[in-house]
Amino acid sequence: MPRKNDVHEMVIYHKKGTYIRPHKHLGKTESFLLISGEADVLIFDEDGNLLKARNLGKYETGKNYYYRIPDSCFHAQIFRKDTIFHEATKGPFDVNSTINAIWAPKETEYHLVKDYMKNLESQLKLLLK
């Protein structure tokens, strides 16, 4: 019988502007270690209100390059540049432990994503004031 992995690790590449629907992982924290590029990690409450944002950049930039998302917390990223990062979370991977935010459009709802991202950018500006 195959051994289940205790840690789920990935090196991920996303192009600037890639949309990932906000989601949470039940019973799991998640960490991001930025390798190259620039991205904002966003934390939301259960209703989709933006609570916190952290801008990540390469180590050499002096920006934060690591962020750990708390357990069962809705989150998303805004990719400011083409970005490569290392992501780690508790394994094994289980698609059923990921809950997508009902208040955010699916990746395939292109006509809604543009307006959602515009609104999110407005919330982000207010939060960072």
Task: For the regions a language model picked out, list residue spans one by one.
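Short, surface-exposed charged micro-motifs
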Residues: 11, 31, 76
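Glycine- and acidic-residue-biased ligand/ion/polar-headgroup-sensing regions
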Residues: 27-47
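Double-stranded beta-helix
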Residues: 49-51, 78-129
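Short loop/turn positions at the edges of beta-strands in beta-sheet-rich folds
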Residues: 16, 26, 35, 71-73, ...
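A short glycine-rich, His/Asp/Glu-containing loop-to-beta-strand
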Residues: 1-22, 28
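Short beta-strand His + acidic residue motifs that chelate non-heme Fe in jelly-roll/DSBH
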Residues: 21-23, 41-43, 67-69, 75-80, ...
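Short acidic-glycine-tyrosine-enriched beta hairpin
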Residues: 45-75
